[in-house]
Amino acid sequence: MSSLTLPSTAPARPGLRQSRLAGALLIAGPATILLAEFISAAAWTDPPYSYTRNFISNLGVQGPSTLFGQYMESPLYWLMNSGFFLFGIITFIGIALLRGLRGWRRWVVILPASAMAAGGVLLGLFPGSGESVDDGTGDFHSMGAFAGFIGANIVAVLLGRMRDRIGLSTGMGRALVIVGIIGLVSTVTYFVVLVSGGETIGVIGLIERGATHPFLITMLCAGASIVRRPGALIGG
């Protein structure tokens, strides 16, 4: 009698499950804040919210308030602040779960990722209203913004350089490095505009998004790549 070979019912290896979870979280983190921004901006109709002119954090201000010559009164301020907070936590966990990082390389990535996560939490807890400048909480908001900008874009550059270790293609790795550099340059430009005094220029919102959105979109794509190829992250 010939023996029958039954299909394997063994569960996926823990490493595969962890890799898929890491990828899913790297999708969910950026998607959360992008979706919160889109919905909050759509709800702001009087006057219409401008992605080019208005600060991102305006969407998290209940208002009415004014800062840097911009009027702020966001109907869904709570949604945007939740998006900031959840982005930082979810994306950090996704990065921490990447199995391809070992030893010192892991900590080199975790440190700026921690700054990114702390930045998201601070942005969510301390909205950047005009009143925040007077009561001192605006300092926490500013620290959160720049910690998030700098930390996230350093993470992008590092993960791009370590692409082989975390299972990303050469193209995706290069994209991460490029968007990280764009983000850091945009952060410097944004800072220079803010400290120059007076009202901000009409494209300040676009400059700020240069520090955030290339990272968010590319990290989301990297997460999707990891979900499709979870085994590539498992070393040894």
Report each predicted region and the residues it spans.
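Short, Lys/Arg-rich, polar N-terminal cytosolic tail immediately upstream
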Residues: 1-18
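N-terminal signal-anchor transmembrane alpha helix
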Residues: 17-47
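Interfacial segments of alpha-helical transmembrane regions
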Residues: 19-28, 102-114, 168-179
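Extracytosolic (periplasmic/ER-lumenal) interhelical loops and adjacent juxtamembrane/interface segments
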Residues: 48-73
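Individual transmembrane alpha-helix segments
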Residues: 66-102
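Membrane-interface loop-to-helix entry segments
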Residues: 76-86, 137-154, 207-213
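Membrane-proximal helix-loop-helix units in multi-pass membrane proteins
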Residues: 118-161
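Terminal transmembrane helical module of multi-pass membrane proteins
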Residues: 157-236
